[in-house]
Amino acid sequence: MNPNCARCGKIVYPTEKVNCLDKFWHKACFHCETCKMTLNMKNYKGYEKKPYCNAHYPKQSFTMVADTPENLRLKQQSELQSQVRYKEEFEKNKGKGFSVVADTPELQRIKKTQDQISNIKYHEEFEKSRMGPSGGEGMEPERRDSQDGSSYRRPLEQQQPHHIPTSAPVYQQPQQQPVAQSYGGYKEPAAPVSIQRSAPGGGGKRYRAVYDYSAADEDEVSFQDGDTIVNVQQIDDGWMYGTVERTGDTGMLPANYVEAI
C-alpha cells in the first residue's frame, strides 16, 4: 500500500517518493519550511523532523552573561566544588587498586621459605625425570657404589702390581690391609665400599648430599655437595633429620637433596 505525503497528505507513488526524516514526501513537496526551496537528499538539513535549507536552518543562540562579581563568585565556587569532589573520589578509590605491604622480617622469612620449597620441588621433579619411571631410583645408589668401588680398586692394582702373585692372591691380603683396610677379602666391588662407609656411623642411616643447601630456618642445617649426613631419621616424604659429619650441625634437611649411601 502506498503511503501518504507528509506535507499535502496525498498518496505518494514510488516514482516520486522521497523517504526522509522518518516520513514520506513527494519530490515537489520536499522543500524548505521557510523559503519553499525544493530540496534533495544532499542539501537538506533536518530540524524537529522538518526540512530546511542551509540558509534558514534554525541556529541555537547563546545568551551572553556579564562577568558580574556574583557570577564570578558562583564560577569560583563551582570550580572549588568540582575540585573537592575530585579529591573525594580519588581518596575513596585510592586503596582499591593495590595496597603496599611492609617488608617485615616475617614476610622475608616466608618469602625465602617459599623460594626454598619451589627449589626443592624443582629438584625433585628433575630427579624423577632423570631416573625415569622404571624403578631406577632404588638402583641408582648401588650403581654409584659399584663405580666408586671400582675406582678405589683400580689405583691399588696400578700402584702395587708386583705384590700380587698369580699363584696365591689370598696370602697377599695382609699386605694390602693397611692401604684398603675396609675392603676385606671380598672380590665384589660394591660390598666393600658399603662396609667402609657404614662403619664410622655407629647407628642410623648415612646419606650423601647431591646439592648445596642453605638453611632457611633455625631448625634446619646447611650443607654442601658431597657432605655426608649421619644418623638420618625420616620425618615425612619431604624432610629428614640428621647430622652433617663435616660441621657437626644437627637439624632438618630436605629429602631430595641427599641420597642413601
UniProtKB/Swiss-Prot annotation:
It comes from the Eukaryota. One of its GO terms (biological process) is monoatomic ion transport. InterPro entries: Lasp1_SH3 (IPR035630), LIM-SH3_domain_protein (IPR051759), Nebulin_repeat (IPR000900), SH3-like_dom_sf (IPR036028), SH3_domain (IPR001452), Znf_LIM (IPR001781). Residues 202-261 form the SH3 domain. Keywords: Acetylation, Actin-binding, Cytoplasm, Cytoskeleton, Ion transport, LIM domain, Metal-binding, Methylation, Phosphoprotein, Repeat, SH3 domain, Transport, Zinc. The modification Phosphoserine is found at S99, S118, S134, S146. The modification N6-methyllysine is found at K75. Nebulin repeats lie at residues 61-95, 97-131. The modification N-acetylmethionine is found at M1. The keyword Cytoplasm applies. Residues 5-56 form the LIM zinc-binding domain. Residues 111-186 are annotated as: Disordered. The keyword Nuclease does not apply. Its main location: cytoplasm. Residues 121-130 have a biased composition (Basic and acidic residues). The modification Phosphothreonine is found at T68, T104. Residues 167-183 have a biased composition (Low complexity). The modification N6-acetyllysine is found at K42. It is found in: Cytoplasm, Cell cortex; Cytoplasm, Cytoskeleton. One of its GO terms (molecular function) is metal ion binding. Interacts with F-actin. Interacts with ANKRD54. Interacts with KBTBD10. Plays an important role in the regulation of dynamic actin-based, cytoskeletal activities. Agonist-dependent changes in LASP1 phosphorylation may also serve to regulate actin-associated ion transport activities, not only in the parietal cell but also in certain other F-actin-rich secretory epithelial cell types. This is LIM and SH3 domain protein 1. The gene is LASP1.
